[in-house]
């Protein structure tokens, strides 16, 4: 892989960029403190902005690593940080990345997550040189699967009781897209 770190990416409505400490208020307000947002995630809702700042600082500290990819999703319409998308796992030997994402409840069902994910897919295939991009979701969160399908990922199957989140042990639906499916070559 040609690791190049978290570069700023832009779409029609979004700027995907590195976290900044001044994103803490938006992050807390727009997604990180909302139990509806974190319901199917592995981290509990944040209860104060100071803990959000500590998380953001940990991200900032990792940005010097060329193989660290973690973007805040900034909505151009209001210049607010409204979610995040990241590579949660790198599988160097198979040129594979696993993507995770979350977005504030006020921004659900607007195509924002799929817009961000599509841009990250393009970046990972074209600049980083991955061969496979994976993502999974709790089967009780079908909207996440719709995002994956909209971005061109193919459903590969469900592994029963193979994952966990804030709901406990869960069935995980697995999706992926391969480089040749993205490029058509």
Predicted feature locations:
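Short loop/turn motifs at secondary-structure junctions and domain boundaries
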Residues: 62-66, 153
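Conserved GNAT-fold acetyl-CoA-binding loop/helix
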Residues: 38-58
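Hydrophobic residues in alpha-helical segments
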Residues: 31-32, 41, 63-64
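Short, surface-exposed helix-loop/turn micro-motifs enriched in polar/charged residues
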Residues: 43-44, 65, 95
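Acyl-donor (CoA/ACP) binding surface of acyl/acetyltransferases
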Residues: 1-26, 30-35, 57, 70-185
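A short hydrophobic/aromatic micro-motif that marks alpha-helical segments and, especially, helix-coil
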Residues: 48-50, 63, 167
């Amino acid at each position: 892989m040609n690791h190049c770190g978290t570069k700023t990416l832009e779409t029609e409505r979004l700027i995907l960029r590195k976290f900044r400490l001044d994103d803490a208020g938006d992050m807390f307000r727009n997604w990180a403190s909302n139990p509806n947002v974190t319901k199917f995630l592995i981290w509990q809702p944040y209860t104060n902005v100071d803990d959000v700042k500590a998380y953001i600082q940990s991200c900032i500290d990792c940005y010097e690593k060329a193989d660290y990819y973690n973007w805040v999703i900034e909505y151009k319409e209001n210049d607010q940080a409204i979610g995040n998308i990241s590579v949660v796992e790198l599988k160097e030997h198979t040129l594979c990345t696993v993507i995770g994402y979350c977005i504030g409840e006020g921004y659900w069902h607007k195509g924002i997550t799929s817009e961000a994910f599509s841009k990250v897919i393009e970046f990972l295939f074209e600049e980083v040189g991955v061969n496979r991009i994976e993502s999974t979701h709790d089967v009780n969160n079908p909207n996440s699967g719709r995002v994956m399908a909209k971005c061109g990922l193919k459903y590969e199957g469900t592994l029963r009781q193979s994952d966990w989140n804030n709901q406990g042990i869960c069935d995980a639906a697995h999706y992926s897209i391969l480089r040749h499916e993205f490029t058509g070559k």
